[in-house]
A protein has these predicted regions:
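Catalytic domains of carbohydrate-active enzymes, especially glycoside hydrolases
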Residues: 61-78, 141
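Alpha-helical packing segments of well-folded alpha/beta enzyme cores
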Residues: 61, 95, 129-133, 165-168, ...
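Extracytoplasmic "Venus flytrap"
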Residues: 51-55, 80-81
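Conserved beta-strand positions in the central sheet of alpha/beta enzyme cores
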Residues: 74, 108-110, 146, 242, ...
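Glycine-rich, proline-tolerant flexible connector loops at the mouths of alpha/beta enzymes
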Residues: 76-96, 152-155
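Active-site acidic/histidine proton-transfer and metal-coordination neighborhood
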Residues: 13-22, 33-39, 66, 96-105, ...
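Histidine-acidic metal/acid-base catalytic patches
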Residues: 2-46, 53-69, 192-302
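Flexible loop residues that form catalytic
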Residues: 78, 114, 150, 246, ...
Length: 302
């Protein structure tokens, strides 16, 4: 992605297509159905560009978020938006301006950097790479960078790996604080997505600028169950949460939303969709409305 011209990098801006009626667009977000002043009223719904947004260039992505009233986005790296660490200063300013000129918030950047590696060189490469994206997120107007733990390698004492991950996160937390960027640790990995393991990692990663990014995994339901596992890490939640489609599968999303409302969570609930609907715009708007209905239902229980 070298020597991008402005036209190549940012793509063509297109007019907003008339994909929804005015009634559809204002049915939830514009009317703000959350009960004002009640716990959970400051939570916001956004998109992770994992599958549904991976092939949208930046103008298309922002336009589609505006159309669906999904007004926050975490940009995954290595996707069509092209927001990567090798952007020059001018290109970074252009990305920032595109978001500033729209109602869509750039929540942050989603990377795949991980800190479980046995090889010191690979570990250091991922730490250094994450720092590059901290600088990038700062420059383009984001507020944080998502990273991963991401495993407990065979043949290495578990405590040693946990210590290594935690210390790496503390280093990034200190670095990110200088740039106003939160380090968001996705609950991810074959073994590290177990909440008791995440709790142990965060016992080491005690820097206040390092937060848990809840990831809505099946492992959340193991052992004593969702609420128990939720409570293990809730005091370390960062500003982002990842969910899947709210109406697909067996994950108890209403219970999860109830827990976030009860604790008066004020961050972003970000959809990291896995399906391949024919009409992603319609599906995205539907997920936003389902989220708002769940929040309203949770508030009514209080």
């Amino acid at each position: 992605m070298t020597d991008y011209s402005r036209r190549q990098f940012l793509g063509h801006s297109l007019g907003v297509a008339g994909l929804f009626t005015a009634t559809t667009l204002t049915s939830c977000s514009n009317l703000r159905i959350f009960a004002p002043g009640k716990p959970g009223s400051k939570m916001r719904f956004g998109l992770v560009t994992y599958l549904w947004g991976k092939d949208w260039d930046l103008p298309t992505l922002i336009r589609n978020c505006e159309t669906t009233k999904v007004l926050g986005v975490e940009l995954r790296t290595q996707h069509a938006h092209g927001v990567e660490s090798n952007l020059n200063a001018r290109q970074r300013r252009e990305v920032r301006k595109r978001f500033e000129d729209s109602p869509v918030t750039l929540v942050g950047l989603g990377t795949n950097f991980a800190f479980h590696h046995i090889e010191h060189e690979r570990l250091q490469k991922d730490i250094d790479g994450a720092k590059q994206y901290v600088r990038l997120s700062h420059d383009v107007g984001g507020s944080g960078v998502k990273v991963k733990p991401n495993d407990l390698p065979e043949g290495v004492p578990v405590e040693k790996t946990i210590e290594q991950i935690g210390k790496s996160l503390n280093e990034l937390g200190r670095f990110g604080a200088d740039y106003g960027q939160e380090i968001r640790v996705e609950v991810h990995g074959r073994k590290t997505q177990r909440l008791p393991i995440m709790k142990r990692i965060f016992d080491v990663a005690d820097h206040p600028n390092v937060g848990v990014c809840w990831n809505s995994n099946d492992e959340d339901l193991t052992g004593p169950g969702l609420e128990y596992n939720f409570n293990l890490v809730k005091n370390r939640f960062g500003d982002t949460v990842h969910i899947r489609e709210l109406n697909i599968g067996q994950y108890p999303y209403q219970q999860l939303i109830n827990l976030f409302v009860k604790m008066d969570y004020k961050g972003w609930i970000l959809l990291e969709a896995r399906t391949k609907p024919k009409d992603r715009i319609k599906a995205l708007a539907e997920q936003r409305m389902l989220f708002e209905q769940m929040v309203a239902k949770a508030q009514a229980r209080l």
